[in-house]
Swiss-Prot record:
Belongs to the UPF0342 family. This is UPF0342 protein SSA_1465. Pfam families: Com_YlbF. Signal peptide: none annotated. InterPro entries: Com_YlbF, YheA/YmcA-like_dom_sf. It comes from the Bacteria.
């Protein structure tokens, strides 16, 4: 029987070969090459951290935070490079969700 870690590493390598993964990687290069897109993306990642901290502490987002979410959504949709990046990322996430379901299926069986 194969070592479970070897299988996980093989899965990681195979994910990197998916056309959807490569499309996200190329799209990320385009974000990095566009100063406006990169600035918005960097700010967005920092904001995501703030949201995670709120969620971890059980705090409800204030109206100010909600307004900031809306603003980021508008900025991202208004920037073709970022919009494309997030669309490509969404396509890849379909694979990741399927893989997660498959991997955690045995754990779910234990809870039945």
């Amino acid at each position: 029987m194969s070592n479970i870690y070897d299988l996980a590493n093989e899965l990681s390598r195979n994910l990197r070969e998916l056309p959807e993964y490569k499309a996200v990687a190329e799209s990320k290069k385009a974000v990095d090459a566009d100063s406006e897109a990169k600035a918005i993306f960097t700010d967005y990642l920092a904001f995501q951290q703030e949201l995670q901290q709120l969620a971890q502490t059980g705090q409800v987002p204030t109206q100010e935070v909600q307004d900031k979410m809306t603003s980021f959504g508008e900025k991202i949709q208004g920037n073709a490079v970022l919009s494309e990046f997030f669309n490509k990322q969404q396509q890849l996430s379909i694979y990741l969700a399927d893989i997660e379901r498959i991997i955690f299926d045995p754990v779910q069986d234990l809870l039945k």
